[in-house]
């Protein structure tokens, strides 16, 4: 029987790993000693860094969408299924209809924004971390002529630079439309500077000041009143807005939470040097599924 390597996840990290294994183990695959399987929960591969370009109508959604089977190496067996549980003690993946044994597993299930973490947030906020969210925000921005845009950020979240990026892009977007003086941009962050990394905060702060972008630190959102359009912080401060853009705290994929492999937020304890799941000799973790405190981008996943 060939050794079976299963890559769980069809995003950038999982696809890169599957393709690299397919090339490096080409001979073993052709000789039947190794089998490489990628399990994706959708036939569509969406390039997530493109969401910001969709938000500002610089590209249409289809520009960032490919069929997953067009992106994987011929040595990779591609399966579309929604795995709901991982059982490491049995070397087994489970879905509603199938079971997938493995000898080695690479978990590349990413992370997702948790809009339910703050009462009222799901009903009130716009986002740019999902395809649907970026389209919805694009349409909302196109209708704005004046008012206050409030950006709230919670941690952890993927792509650490994205909140700063969208804020600067909003400034540019409204300047190009000739209505920047009618728009109040307010950026918030939960700690004592506008980014978790000091060098980035040191660079971004004067950029905000030069562009008349207001910012508020130690801003920790507690709840949102969608009807009154008010964001309330843990300190009890009320902030009115005309449009709320939120980066909520992210959490691990449902399969990780369901399998109890991660911490309370569903991020998997991972050895930073080997990328092995802590306590395992045959499970590896890449990208946003790990609990590693580093900036994770597509090209570092």
Walk through the language-model features, giving the residues of each.
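FAD-binding core/adjacent interface of flavoenzyme oxidoreductases
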Residues: 1-4, 76-165, 172-178, 245
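FAD-site-proximal beta/loop scaffold in flavoenzymes
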Residues: 121-145, 238-301
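Conserved beta-strand scaffold positions in the cores of enzyme catalytic domains, especially
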Residues: 38, 78, 125-127, 215, ...
């Amino acid at each position: 029987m060939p050794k079976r390597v299963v890559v769980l996840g069809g995003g950038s990290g999982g696809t890169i790993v599957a393709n690299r294994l397919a090339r490096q183990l080409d001979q073993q695959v052709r000789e039947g000693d190794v089998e490489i399987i990628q399990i994706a929960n959708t036939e569509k591969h969406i390039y997530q860094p493109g969401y910001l370009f969709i938000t500002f109508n610089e590209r249409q959604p289809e520009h960032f969408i490919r069929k997953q089977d067009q992106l994987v190496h011929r040595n990779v067996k591609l399966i579309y299924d929604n795995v709901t549980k991982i059982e490491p003690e049995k070397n087994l993946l489970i879905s509603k209809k199938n079971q997938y044994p493995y000898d080695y597993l690479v978990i590349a299930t990413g992370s997702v924004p948790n809009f339910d973490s703050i009462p009222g947030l799901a009903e009130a906020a716009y986002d740019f971390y999902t395809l649907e969210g970026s389209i919805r925000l694009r349409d909302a921005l196109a209708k704005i002529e004046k008012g206050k845009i409030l950006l709230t950020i919670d941690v952890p979240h993927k792509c650490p630079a994205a909140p700063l990026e969208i804020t600067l892009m909003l400034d540019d977007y409204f300047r190009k439309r000739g209505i920047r003086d009618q728009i109040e941009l307010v950026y918030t962050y939960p700690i004592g500077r506008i980014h978790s990394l000091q060098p980035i905060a040191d660079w971004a702060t004067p950029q905000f000041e030069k562009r008349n972008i207001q910012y508020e630190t130690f801003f920790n959102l507690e709840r949102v009143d969608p009807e009154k359009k008010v964001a309330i912080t843990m300190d009890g401060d009320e902030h009115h807005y005309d449009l709320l853009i939120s980066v909520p705290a992210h959490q691990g994929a449902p399969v990780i939470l369901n399998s109890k492999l991660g911490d309370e937020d569903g991020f998997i304890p991972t050895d930073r040097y080997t990328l092995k799941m802590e306590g395992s000799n045959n499970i590896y973790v890449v990208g946003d599924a790990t609990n590693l405190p580093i900036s994770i981008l597509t090209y570092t996943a």
